[in-house]
Design a protein with these regions (language model features):
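Glycan-recognition and catalytic cores of secretory/periplasmic carbohydrate-active enzymes
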Residues: 1-279
Length: 279
């Protein structure tokens, strides 16, 4: 999924072709016993059979491999390597090669959190490398990009992009001790507050424009947490780390509005006692 510029691609297509050239959803990742036997040979496939549970996902009896029971890790890892090599000869799904700021920022945040919890320091280093690539490719003075495609700039960033960059960079600063990431987070968050603040104290999805008769104003979670939820989390984290009382107060102001977002309400609760909204 990693692109040449260090960012991560948006996704892979669900569909790809089978050996006969017919298109199926998920076919690239699925197996049955015959395919396993073709890849491993009869003896090894029979050894593996009781150790993997094949749950059919379609009418062809194909499914994903799910380990069960006690296994010999050295042997089964060798088998998995062989199956992975066999899968690599299949027709791979197409890759959407645009890079999206918010998704890359969420990946940074996830790598940092998982790396710290599981003590996988290489994940924190991967997060640092990704953050460096994201800052280089998608930030220009005070303006961020939402997308790029093969290093060509796309549309301007929206609120969730700014919020997650600030949130993830602050987390990276805490994990690495490198203050430059907190400086970047403060810069990005300041721009976000200036660009996306709504009159009711919450945050707009995108900047006001003469092209828009109504500016979107989302408080509910969808594929990503709502922009207001992300901004509250970012303002709180960056405000505490950078000792910016104005950011914390802005988070408090935004917290008075959300009504139906799980992440928004979770963000409010992080503000502490006495900060919950009253309806």
């Amino acid at each position: 999924m990693r692109l040449p510029n260090g960012l991560y691609a948006a996704g892979l297509d669900a569909d790809s072709d089978d050996a006969a050239g017919h298109t199926h959803e998920g076919i690239y990742y699925l197996w049955n016993q015959d395919l396993i036997t073709d890849a491993l040979g009869t003896d090894e496939a029979e050894w593996l059979r009781p150790l993997v549970h094949l749950e059919p996902c379609n009418d062809n009896g194909l499914g994903t491999l799910q380990l069960r029971g006690r296994v010999e890790w050295e042997r089964i890892n060798a088998d998995m390597d062989t199956l992975l090599e066999a899968r690599g000869r299949r027709s791979a799904p197409a890759r959407d090669e645009k890079a999206i700021t918010v998704w890359n920022a969420m990946l940074i945040d996830g790598l940092v959190e998982a790396g710290m919890i599981l003590r996988e320091w290489s994940w924190v280093e991967q997060a640092r490398e990704l953050a460096d690539s994201l800052w280089t490719a998608h930030w220009d003075d005070s303006m961020a990009l939402r997308t790029s495609f093969h290093d060509r700039p796309g549309v301007p960033a929206v609120c969730e992009d700014y919020a997650w960059v600030a949130l993830s960079f602050a987390g990276l600063a805490g994990a690495t001790g490198e203050s430059v990431w907190l400086d970047h987070a403060v810069e990005v968050l300041g721009e976000a507050v200036a660009r996306f603040s709504a009159v009711d104290g919450s945050f707009l999805d995108a900047e006001n424009s003469f092209l828009l008769t109504v500016t979107a104003h989302t408080l509910t979670d969808d594929a990503c947490p709502s922009p207001t939820a992300a901004m509250v989390m970012a303002l709180r984290r960056v405000g505490l780390m950078a000792k910016r009382a104005d950011f914390i107060e802005r988070a408090n102001k935004a917290s008075r509005g959300p009504t139906s977002s799980g992440v928004s309400n979770a963000a409010i609760r992080r503000l502490g006692p006495g900060r919950l909204p009253h309806y």
